[in-house]
Amino acid sequence: MNLNANDIVTFKLTTGEEIIARIKTIESDHYLIDQPISAVLGPQGLQLMPSLFSAKMEQTVRLNTGSWIMVAETREDIRNSYIQATTGIAPVTKQIITG
């Protein structure tokens, strides 16, 4: 998997937490990520919540490469929820129009 700036990905941290974020820049020992959100399993299923409660949501955050054990492309439905949570814009999903 090739990671690029502006990709929305899911990181599995060494602590077991999952963070969804948009990659800003990739360095050899760290990534700069925008608006990290944690994926948490709750009574209603998967929920998204801020990863840093006391930080400004719109700031860029440093994530050391030693802090995560896996990274993957975020599922489309979760990606759309992330975009809506961070921008307030609900992405349009592809639909087949029938007559």
Language-model segments: what does each one mean?
Residues 2-99:
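Conserved RNA-binding domains used in RNP assembly and mRNA/RNA metabolism
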